[in-house]
Amino acid sequence: MAISWRTWLKKTIHCDNSYVRTGLAEFLGTFLLVLLLNGMIITAHMSVRNADGTMAHPLNTAHLAFGGGLAVMVAVLVSGGISGAHLNPAVTTTMLVMGRLSPLKSLVYIFMQYMGAFFAASILYAVYFESILAYDYGERQVLGANGTAGWFATYPQEHISLVTQIFDAILGTGLLVMGIFAIIDPNNMAVPKGQIPLYVGFLISSLIFSFSYNAGAALNPARDLAPRLFLWVIGYGAEAFTARGHLWWLVPVIGPHVGGLLGGVTYQMFIGAHYQSDRKLKPATIMDEDDDTNATYNTITTTTHQKVYNGRRNFDESVPLKTVHA
């Protein structure tokens, strides 16, 4: 009997190793995030430039916000069922500290996130090489009228101090992680698994609307540092790191990690720790460590009355009591 190519492919390359599966998912998810997000930024800049090099009109914040939200939504849709779609080292670090991810797997996640972002920057540069050439006339510039480095990495406004840059990154990423915790918390609004990517996309759009002016919404270390390294490799030079101050490049790397931890702790202190004991459920969502049960948002053990929450807002007393690893 003939088998389909999909069946053959699955039998040929299927891997049961959790580290490999989740690593591949994080690579592809982060690749898509950076590819679509930065591609949208490039399109937004080029669409407001006249043939003579002048700006036809300012950048449309709505374009950037909705484009960013859609990019994240697609990335989470693609990779969420396998790895939980962290796609951000700051999110992974927070999950590690909160006990939702093992130390070794967190290293795999973060490494593959940076790799996916770097590869996305290289593909995007190849796709838009001719357009970038027409934009900057062959002279790679980081900032200025013909600067294109900001299409790949974040740079603050000239008048923004280092202290404000740090506060901006911490606050923005703190709100990001707080929002993610609320979305994936089955004790809260119990967002269905299939709707999680949509709500995370809305969250990103809201943050870009609110925190993109100072420094371009520096919320993701992988999305920022990996493309910045690519810029340095292809000829933008050390200025890719030193523009707007020699310390700026560290802000989008360190700040989001601090902000993510603060956001996660804040959510637990103000919301997560205050559910009534008779309705407290054990979180197991697509943002948790990969597992055949929790990665697909299956079931969550509740009380000894053998009522099992199945992710669809109903209880089934016929399901045997079991423990779900989160």
UniProtKB/Swiss-Prot annotation:
Induction: Expressed in early embryonic state, adult active, and adult anhydrobiotic state. Transcript abundance is high and expression levels are completely unaffected by desiccation or rehydratation.
Record-stated family: Belongs to the MIP/aquaporin (TC 1.A.8) family.
Compartments, record wording: Cell membrane
Protein name stated in the entry: Aquaporin-3
TM region(s), chain numbering: 24-44, 64-84, 107-127, 166-186, 196-216, 247-267
Chief location category: membrane
Position of sequence motif NPA 2: 220-222
Domain notes: Aquaporins contain two tandem repeats each containing three membrane-spanning domains and a pore-forming loop with the signature motif Asn-Pro-Ala (NPA).
One Pfam family from the record: MIP
SUPFAM superfamilies: Aquaporin-like
Repeat listed as a keyword: yes
Topology of the protein relative to the lipid bilayer: Multi-pass membrane protein
NCBIfam families in alphabetical order: MIP
